[in-house]
Amino acid sequence: MITPSFIISSFLSLPTVVEASVTNKVNYSKDVIYQIVTDRFSDGNPANNPSGAIFSQNCSDLHKYCGGDWQGIINKMNDGYLTDLGITALWISQPVENVYALHPSGYTSYHGYWARDYKKTNPYFGNFSDFDRLVSTAHNKGIKIIMDFTPNHSSLALETNPNYVENGALYNNGALLGNYSNDRNKLFHHNGGTDFSSYEDSIYRNLYDLADYDLNNKVVDQYLKESIKLWLIKIDGIRVDAVKHMSEGWQTSLMSDIYTYKPVFTFGEWFLGTGEVDPQNHHFANESGMSLLDFQFGQTIRSVLKDRTSNWYDFNEMIKSTEKDYDEVIDQVTFIDNHDMSRFSMVVFNFQTDIALAVLLTSRGVPTIYYGTEQYLTGGNDPDNRKPMKTFDRSTNSYKITSKLASLRQRNSALGYGNTTERWINSDVYIYERKFGNSIVLTAVNSSNRNQTISNLNTSLPQGNYTDELQQLLDGNTITVNANGSANSPQLQANSVAVWQVTKESTSPLIGHVGPMIGKTGNTVTVSGEGFGDKKGSVLFGSTSAEIVSWSNTEIQVKVPNVTAGHYNLSVVNATNTKSPAYEKFEVLSGNQVSVRFAVNNATTNSGTNVYIVGNVSELGNWDPNKAIGPMFNQVMYKYPTWYYDISVPAGKNLEYKYIKKDHNGNVTWQSGNNRTYTSPATGTDTVISNW
């Protein structure tokens, strides 16, 4: 039988792509990620367990290896546990070889964050053949694989003790590159540990006792970029550890390298505490080329439903503010708990976890479920929050809720792409609507211990009666919507959630997602949405048409056109010449990117005045002082009055630039004399120093 999509493909002589499949590695909007600490999930092959002091039989010592491996994950895909849960992406522990030594306090590298060789596997998880089977099994089940990645550091080390653990040693496929206390090639920073007092301090000093890479070192830069490409042959996504502790400039050059080689969805960890809002966090998410774990979402939902220190007004304010602060809020990765915080179910009733999961799965962003949350696994802080999975019960309420809402995310584009509108709110009740085109999801949450009758509720749902998509797993009722959009005063049961929806695909083009959101001319970009039509139209970057690689009604792949570097709005024009609303702020890069450290000596300033750099390419602000890069640093790698900053700039490019000073009122003082000139390297990194 020939499917309609095959007929269309033949007519256009273009391949078609299926939305929300494993082939779309840059769009996770409709996916549900399941985070696994590999060592703690399932032991599928006891033969690869470690021996001796680093292994804990029956996991009685949570600081040690417990036996979980890739075969265990494969088994749980094959027996249907993960697929029936509705999971479409697995975030696994960093798969690379980690240190074997036992820390003096009894700690081990079971978590995967103490790398020693990024070009080898952790043998306690499996070998490369096992990893290939993990990925192929996942893909056959419609599941993507995301790997953790730690380009910030190797492993624990002390300047004064070369025998401490493994001295931060770094290997290149078995060959020693260097170690921390005998760092002849200057692979690491030697500035002591960070006290987290400033952004600069957190970047250029060690995070705790972890040997901090000097990412401005050409050997380190090349090695890390080579290493991730080895894994990119198989994987579908990357979670980058500790992005707050590396320069944005180097990380942007990394993302440019990845997107040119094999674009995959990438998100980073920038930890925020309860109630913490950091503009630098937003800037990074908007400019670096990668998304972030959404700690504002995670901390707020925990405050509302777990700790009961906030209410739904606070949650709604967070939703509204982050929609403004993040250019791509649907690409931020949301959660209710993870490996760096206490388990959500630690001090709450099971129904509170159920409510939190329902909100997570119907809110904007890419939802991530920490392994065992669906089993109400408890635990305090590390390592208690990393207990082994004991049961794989498919009858828990959380398992059923996740399964139903994961399925709805796949079917209804409002959950993947839609905006959020608050429809009714008080301290205990939150009713919010997600809408994309004609598809709508209305979610009603009552987190109080008493029933609530809702008056004056309005919605975009069409006239009709709607049953709860959760089938009363959380005591949701039906709702009746009138022709004018008013609802007939529904009653919400105590501690309940109801989800009502209509799925109706748009017949005119609507862009829901573009990924990645940075790229140079010729890079492949995927445009997802609805109503594109089966016949090829066009995709515009501003007013310039892009080369079409593939086209379907819900997904288009294009090549970034040859346009001047800068930000562009994208739009889709279908075959009947109907144009979509613009999708804003795609950044066209000037070319391949390299990280360069710019430094200027003798730049004295008054209190409240900072130094910036501006120049002749988009990456340096195109001579616009409002887009100048900075404020620059002056405390760690260089001391005031020398200022410095690591910046991603086009490779092999003749650059012109100047330094400027900005005071707290925005007044600008330009560096005198001719423009500074410099040719960036074709590959690698560099440092260029001039005088004020």
Curated annotation (Swiss-Prot):
GO terms for biological process: carbohydrate metabolic process. The keyword Glycosyltransferase applies. GO terms for molecular function: alpha-amylase activity; cyclomaltodextrin glucanotransferase activity; metal ion binding; starch binding. The active site is at D241, E269. Keywords: Calcium, Disulfide bond, Glycosyltransferase, Metal-binding, Secreted, Signal, Transferase. Its cofactor is Ca(2+). One of its GO terms (cellular component) is extracellular region. This is Cyclomaltodextrin glucanotransferase. It comes from Brevibacillus brevis.
